[in-house]
């Protein structure tokens, strides 16, 4: 699919990787999960991102996952492949492999983690990937996970690269507003923070790359529709009820909460891979009460006052 198809996407789901109890990928669980997403307003799907537990997936496993999902999706929505690591050479090699594999609208490359590069180092990292790739690149800027932050100024330098088409931004609404105001016209801005989606869309973002859309896609779609129709009273009312659900979804290291909910809903999401562990049973029950049942009293026993902890 093309850039234009991607531009139409408002809700892109950062897809989990379903696992068997032994830690192997449960490929048989993928069709039901994908059909569930598509039935609840997912416009595009990101594979092998953070929510997919990509740090614990080998590249061979990622390619197997890509093939399985592509077979089910069959061109119905655009797909994005997670292609970046903290090793520029490895990222280049893998993005070339994914481009040759085919079937993706773009590749998502994360800001290098652990190395703590300078702004110039980050610029050169993404430039090298984009120069080498036949696949358009979206940058993933999430300092809560990688420690360093790609500044808006560096992002705008990269936005001028013809093969860097967008960013998944997980910094601040102030940064997002600055980027939206100063970016090239065709550069795509997605928030990666479910709790910020309401504000980001009102600022002019193109959409959200979401975890919550696994479980709350309908209300996200309803909120975005209300924003598009300038019904801010309705959109704000949805957002107020949505925030406790986001709090619950990120009250334990992700994707453990969303996997607990999907398992409860009858989908075979399975466990997480170490070093991540499932949410404790009592915590999982509270999370489910909030996210599925809308039991806001249960929020008193979950993380409150934040939209998304730095998990």
UniProtKB/Swiss-Prot annotation:
Pfam families attached to this UniProt entry: DHDPS
Pathway(s) this gene product operates in, as recorded in its UniProt entry: Amino-acid biosynthesis; L-lysine biosynthesis via DAP pathway; (S)-tetrahydrodipicolinate from L-aspartate: step 3/4
Predominant localisation class: cytoplasm
Entry's Gene Ontology cellular component terms: cytosol
Enzyme nomenclature, EC number: 4.3.3.7
HAMAP family linked to this entry: DapA
Quaternary data: Homotetramer; dimer of dimers.
Protein name according to UniProt: 4-hydroxy-tetrahydrodipicolinate synthase
Organism of provenance: Streptococcus pneumoniae (strain ATCC 700669 / Spain 23F-1)
Gene designation per UniProt: dapA
